[in-house]
Amino acid sequence: VYALVFRYLLKFTPGPGDPSGLDVFALWVLCGLLPWLFFANTTTMGMRAIVDNQGLVKNVLFDRETLIFGFVGAQVLTFTLELSLLLGLLLLAGNMFLPWLPILVVVVACLTVFTAGVTLLLAASYVYFRDLQYLWSICTQLGFFAAPIVYPIGLLPDRLQTVVRLNPITAFVTSVRNLVYDLRGPTAFDLTVMVCWSVTSLLIGLGAFSRLSPRFAEEL
């Protein structure tokens, strides 16, 4: 559906992969869509992890963070399976991305840490503010179009490109696509952005969760 709408109706054409030469728009979209779906689905569903397990939270003494990390871990397994299927399709299309797999693992690890941090912050906040799920739904819809997932960033004016690059997910999407579709490494800028956002997200998420968690049982 994305391939039909954005390539044939809206005429978004990223061009062949550089230097891979691969020109399959559906695969190009999937390379950006899968990392985004992992982030969006994990944060959207993960924010309910504390509330949905309130019986456990109120009656059992344990580190509540384990609920979040356990959920994120389960989503990582799903993402790994989906990514493996995509990599299989890319191999069938002739893309020999195998030398880039170690860097792909690093990028996925950074994405996982970033996602875990955001999920921790959302889950802790959701206990106190239940309308957060609706606000976050709007944010993810805006975030989808504020990242080059279904369109090449080169189509945007320079000023708008700068704005899009401020979206944390842009670096992850671009890096995954560069590695397995274009067959080239991520830029130094994207690597720096991914590491900085991952560390910052986790620190903020853990800090907020630690501060808010003592009152979870009372609020629930």
Predicted regions mapped to residue ranges:
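Mid-bilayer segments of alpha-helical transmembrane spans in multi-pass integral membrane proteins
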Residues: 33-42, 46, 76-84, 112, ...
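Transmembrane helix boundary and interhelical loop/hinge segments in multi-pass membrane proteins
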Residues: 38-65, 69-76
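Transmembrane helix-boundary elements of multi-pass transport/secretion proteins
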Residues: 1-41, 45, 187-188
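Small-residue-enriched core segments of transmembrane alpha-helices in multipass membrane transport
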Residues: 1, 22-38, 102-117, 141-145
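Short hydrophobic, aromatic-rich alpha-helical segments embedded in or entering the lipid bilayer
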Residues: 142-192
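Hydrophobic alpha-helical transmembrane segments
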Residues: 19-22, 45-59, 80-89, 134-151
